[in-house]
A protein has these predicted regions:
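Alpha-solenoid HEAT/Armadillo-like helical repeat scaffolds in large eukaryotic proteins
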Residues: 4-12, 36-45
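C-terminal interaction surface of TIR/SEFIR-family domains
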Residues: 13, 45-80, 182-217
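Conserved BB-loop
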Residues: 110-138
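An anion/phosphate-binding loop that grips the pyrophosphate of nucleotide cofactors and donors
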Residues: 145
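Conserved TIR/SEFIR loop-to-helix hotspot centered on a Trp-containing motif
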Residues: 154-172
Length: 217
């Protein structure tokens, strides 16, 4: 089974399937290489089929009808979910996804296991499914992480989600590191220990639920 996922990670043209294989392997503490789409080979001489595979099939997506309550149940009852552990939990704005992916590639190259919610728990943690279970799932993933990396940007500084994650991780008394979005763009991946606790809010959980309910309902 593991060999199958390594092969899928190395050769699959569909981006979503390749990412699924990559993060499945990562979750079990393997260190696969995340290949960029432009380096994937299309093994056919048929021009029409090559165009389809390269431009259409590679971007096709499927929808998994799952929700945070189901993932919470899996975490509580599945051995597979319980053995997951991460070196870093990435707290970030989804608007900075390009830079976050660069950071993940860098940390993976250093043999670090990364948790990023829109990748590892794809379809479970969609923000429009927000509920207490969503927050409990995030909390469990943070408990499974040794440290947190906050990707600082204008987007993340105004993110209610980042504030929630930072507050919860602070309560866990685990290391919190910070990296500027611009630093990632400039290929400077040095992590610095956070020394500005601007985010601390004793009512952060309630504030997050109230804010999100106004946005998504």
């Amino acid at each position: 089974m593991i060999q199958f996922f390594f092969k899928l990670n190395d050769t699959e043209l569909n981006k979503q399937l390749r990412f699924e294989a990559f993060y499945y392997l990562q979750e079990f503490n393997f260190n696969p290489r995340l290949r960029k789409q432009k380096y994937m080979l299309v093994h056919t001489n048929n021009k029409e089929r090559k165009d389809y595979l390269k431009n259409i099939y590679s971007n096709e997506k499927y929808i998994i009808k799952l929700n945070p309550n189901e993932l919470e149940y899996r975490i509580e009852n599945s051995k597979e979910q319980k053995i997951k552990s991460y070196d870093y939990f990435i707290s970030h704005s989804s608007k900075d996804s390009k830079e976050v992916q660069e950071l993940i590639r860098k940390e993976n190259s250093l043999k670090k296991n990364i948790f990023c919610d829109w990748i590892n728990d794809i379809d479970y943690l969609k923000r429009h499914l927000l509920c207490n279970a969503t927050l409990r799932v995030l909390e469990e993933r943070m408990k499974q992480s040794k440290a947190l990396i906050f990707v600082k940007s204008e987007n993340s500084l105004s993110s209610i989600w980042c504030k929630y994650e930072l507050n919860f991780f602070y309560e866990l008394q685990k290391p919190i590191f910070i990296i500027e979005k611009d630093s990632i763009i400039n290929k400077d991946f040095e992590l610095k220990t956070i020394n500005d606790y601007w985010f601390i809010d004793s009512d952060y959980k309630e504030s997050t639920l109230i804010f999100a309910s106004k946005i998504y309902n």
